[in-house]
């Protein structure tokens, strides 16, 4: 990966952490570190854990900017508890004719304050990824 692509990925990641999606309680942003561009059309599943079992509560796909601004709509309840957002990355890489070691990236997180907005950026490459709690 060229230095220019690395710098672009870092700048995009920083920008994503500054953006708060007022439309929903949960947003995601996927950036392709190999190309330094947003990852469009990555399918994402959101699940909640109830009594030790995962239940799907929302699905979506990233837009041309690599974002889902409201994976969970503002009027949908977000209770305190454990959640899992799974980024289905295999199809994204397949469309781009790129082999990947990670066909999906599950991110488990805990909600303490249901009134807050939660943002989960994913920095993605074919053989690695990084995520964190954005704002």
Predicted regions and their residues:
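Short, glycine- and charge-enriched coil/turn segments that flank and shape catalytic ligand pockets
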Residues: 21, 50-53, 75-77
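Feature of secretome-associated and extracellular-like proteins
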Residues: 2-3, 80-135
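Beta-strand-rich domain onsets/edges
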Residues: 5-39, 54, 130-135
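Solvent-exposed strand-loop boundary residues in beta-sheet-rich modules
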Residues: 34, 50-52, 91
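Short loop/turn segments at connectors of secondary-structure elements within structured domains
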Residues: 22, 38-40, 79-81, 116
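Hydrophobic beta-strand segments
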Residues: 42-46
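Short, acidic Ser/Thr/Gly-rich low-complexity loop/linker segments typical of extracellular
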Residues: 52-71
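Short Pro-Gly-centered beta-turn/loop motif in secreted/extracellular proteins
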Residues: 69-81
């Amino acid at each position: 990966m060229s230095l220019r692509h690395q710098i672009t990925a870092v700048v995009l990641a920083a920008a994503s952490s500054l953006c708060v999606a007022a439309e929903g309680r949960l947003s995601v942003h996927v950036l392709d570190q190999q190309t330094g561009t947003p990852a469009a059309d990555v399918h994402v599943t959101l699940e909640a854990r109830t009594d030790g079992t995962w239940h799907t509560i929302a699905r979506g796909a990233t837009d041309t900017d690599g974002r889902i601004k409201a994976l969970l709509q503002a009027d949908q309840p977000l209770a305190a508890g454990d959640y899992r957002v799974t980024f289905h990355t295999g199809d994204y890489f397949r469309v781009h004719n790129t082999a990947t070691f990670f066909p999906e990236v599950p991110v488990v997180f805990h909600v303490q304050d249901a009134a807050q907005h939660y943002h989960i950026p994913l920095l993605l490459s074919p053989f690695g990824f990084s995520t964190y709690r954005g704002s």
